[in-house]
Amino acid sequence: MIDLKLLRDNPQEFSDRLAKRGKFDLQPILDLDRQQRELEVERSQLQARSNAIAKQIGEKMKSGNKSDPALEGLRAEAGQIKTTLAELEPKEKQLKDELEQQLLLIPNLPSDSTPVGKDEAENVEVRRWGEEYIPKSKDILPHWEMGEKLGILNFERSVKIAQSRFATLIGAGAALERALIQFMLDRHTSAGYLEVLPPFLINSTSLTATGQLPKFAEESFKCEADDLWLAPTAEVPVTNLYRDEILTAENLPIYHCAYTPCFRREAGSYGRDTRGLIRLHQFNKVELVKLVHPSTSEQEHEALVRDASAILEALQLPYRVIELCTGDLGFSAAKCYDLEVWLPSAGCYREISSCSNFYDFQARRGKIRFKESGQKGTQFVHTLNGSGLAVGRTMAAILENYQQPDGSVRIPPVLQPYLGRETL
């Protein structure tokens, strides 16, 4: 959530920064904030007058002036104030609720270091790693064809079980998926991340804290009877472990890694990536989540990108790092790097990880704070997260980049101990 005080004190500066992301009308928020504060002042003044009247009545009663004509007037005024305060209470609550709902729809301010641009065409390439294999003809099968040829992927039967955009992994395919998950978790825990296995069903409050609700409700699957949602990413349950808590500065930084299946409706992607493992309603992912001191969040963000990149390098998969421009940032992010892996069958890079720094945006929504030793008050932590990695897309990259002339797929050396074999 945005800092309302910052908006109130510097509306033009705030508006200019937000305009780098697109058009947003902040006037309704400023109007609601003004009305709410006016009601607060009125209530405060009435309460002060009520207290003064009560004191006057008490003094007159104590002095024995129970028949003082002024008492009747004071009691009448006190009654009127009580009625007015009772009328103000629902109005104030309504304004507060409306203001909060409006604030929840405003995205995070972009970092000053985020490149300014309208859309993904203006994203900035930071670096590349590895050598891209460019097929001379059709000697590289798309991963879905290779998977079906090897008998390890089945999409047709998945449609029968569920609908389109689901996949069934069979035999060595299921084993490769498990191996990738375990390999990723092993690497991240060795790097200092504490593993978490959270609930896969989450409530609306959790999704609101991390920014998926209320704006992106149509992107997630909901269990209507229980107000529970299927987790779109482990970022949500892991970050919410600390919702409504006050940590100590000594607790920071906190590093977590988590494997979860992820569920997304992909409502805005009709007609895109209709085949294969790239865009599914259900997919596995290993997520990295950090809660850090604000003074270190920029360094922690760069380290997060390195930790996610290390998995691709260990698997010897060519990739590039893209810094997203302001017009392509996710709703909650202030700064974001995407890792894109090379898919030779398409001759292009595809996103496999998104590493975001949210600053205090999520912490403000989720009330995740910390206290410095010996200091008064609390501060909001900074939260970060990144995929480490999307497992299905990693499998797709392996099935394409490791194809052999004899029609087999070589297993990356670091995965061979997990599978006990060298090829698929």
Swiss-Prot record:
Annotated Gene3D superfamilies: Bira Bifunctional Protein, Domain 2 (3.30.930.10), Serine-tRNA synthetase, tRNA binding domain (1.10.287.40)
Entry's EC annotation: 6.1.1.11
Protein family according to the UniProt entry: Belongs to the class-II aminoacyl-tRNA synthetase family. Type-1 seryl-tRNA synthetase subfamily.
Domain of life assignment: Bacteria
An individual GO BP term: seryl-tRNA aminoacylation
List of residues binding ATP: R264, R265, E266, E351, I352, S353, S354
Subcellular location: Cytoplasm
Residues at which L-serine binds: T233, A234, E235, E287, S387
Alphabetical list of SUPFAM superfamilies matching this protein: Class II aaRS and biotin synthetases (SSF55681), tRNA-binding arm (SSF46589)
Domain comment in the entry: Consists of two distinct domains, a catalytic core and a N-terminal extension that is involved in tRNA binding.
The name this protein goes by in its record: Serine--tRNA ligase
Main enzyme class: ligase
Gene Ontology CC: one annotated term: cytoplasm
Catalytic activity: tRNA(Ser) + L-serine + ATP = L-seryl-tRNA(Ser) + AMP + diphosphate + H(+); tRNA(Sec) + L-serine + ATP = L-seryl-tRNA(Sec) + AMP + diphosphate + H(+)
PANTHER family reported for this sequence: SERINE--TRNA LIGASE, SERYL-TRNA SYNTHETASE
Keyword Ligase appears in the UniProt entry: yes
Pathway of action: Aminoacyl-tRNA biosynthesis; selenocysteinyl-tRNA(Sec) biosynthesis; L-seryl-tRNA(Sec) from L-serine and tRNA(Sec): step 1/1
